[in-house]
């Protein structure tokens, strides 16, 4: 199916590894010009290089700290200066450590808030200014099913992702008149295919410390589809929502990609 993403300009934050990497590869495969935005320079360059080798789309890496407004502004200025527009923004940056709330400290909360929520605000703010002027655009934010269910050891993370869900609905209402669509994708437990998908800064770097294989097997049994999600599952949903051709009348939605864990 032609998604009409050829030559579209797409920024993917957190694009160096895991879900973000799969999203970048999907967009490049469709012929988009992709900016891999991430703190991890080494992994970001690996991702952009792999995409350029495999697909026809132009993929470049730009180091960016989504919690720093100057860094974010520089990312968007570079993109517009080089390509003249931003058609798609995917907010794929995310970070968490599984800890009970009473075992954490305020500096831990602040880090989760800065990366998972403020980062989405910073990037969406810059994107909307460009997209509203252009009269079209698509913003997709990666949230989590923890935002819907209230998961133990994810109190602050889940709360911030719930904030992302609400924020995306609101900007969908505010900016639809300019032709801009804003949607959210909520993965469940999603693990990389192998270590090559995981960067040093990824929350999945030490996956074995988060979930044992036995725990993952138990989680899979609770799901209607009986299997744990992979980055490509999430990336496929993002690709659909990014396309105005196939999702042009979809905005303000929160789509779970979790094997049926959440059906709300």
PLM feature spans:
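C-terminal substrate-recognition "lid" of short-chain dehydrogenase/reductases
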Residues: 4, 227-257, 262
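Canonical Rossmann dinucleotide-binding motif of NAD(H)/NADP(H)-dependent dehydrogenases/reductases
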Residues: 3-35
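Substrate-binding pocket helix/loop in short-chain dehydrogenase/reductase
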Residues: 100-101, 105-113, 204-208, 215, ...
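Alpha-helical segment proximal to the catalytic Tyr-Lys
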Residues: 129, 173-174
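Active-site loop immediately N-terminal to the catalytic Tyr-X3-Lys motif
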Residues: 102, 149-155, 177, 226
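Active-site helix of classical SDR
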Residues: 124, 160
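Residue(s) in the substrate-gating loop at a strand-loop-helix junction
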Residues: 144
């Amino acid at each position: 199916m032609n998604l009409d993403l050829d030559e579209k300009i797409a920024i993917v934050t957190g694009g160096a590894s895991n879900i973000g990497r799969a999203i970048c590869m999907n967009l490049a495969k469709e012929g988009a010009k992709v900016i891999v935005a991430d703190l991890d320079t080494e992994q970001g360059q690996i991702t952009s290089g792999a995409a350029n080798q495999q697909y026809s789309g132009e993929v470049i890496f730009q180091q960016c700290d989504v919690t720093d407004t100057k860094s974010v502004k520089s990312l968007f200025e570079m993109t517009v200066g080089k390509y003249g527009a931003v058609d798609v923004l995917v907010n794929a940056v995310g970070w968490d450590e599984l800890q009970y709330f009473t075992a954490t400290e305020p500096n831990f909360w602040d880090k989760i808030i800065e990366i998972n929520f403020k980062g989405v605000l910073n990037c969406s703010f810059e994107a909307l200014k460009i997209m509203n002027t252009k009269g079209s655009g698509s913003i997709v934010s990666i949230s989590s099913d923890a935002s819907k269910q209230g998961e133990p050891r994810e109190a602050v993370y889940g709360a911030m992702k719930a904030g992302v869900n609400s924020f995306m609905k609101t900007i969908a209402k505010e900016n639809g008149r300019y032709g801009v669509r804003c949607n959210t994708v909520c993965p469940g437990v999603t693990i990389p295919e192998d270590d090559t998908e995981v960067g040093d800064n990824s929350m999945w770097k030490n996956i074995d410390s988060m979930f044992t294989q036995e725990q993952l097997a138990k989680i899979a049994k609770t799901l209607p589809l009986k299997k744990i999600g992979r980055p490509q599952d999430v990336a496929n949903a993002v690709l659909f929502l990014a396309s105005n051709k196939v999702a042009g009348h979809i905005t303000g939605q929160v789509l779970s990609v979790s094997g049926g864990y959440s059906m709300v």
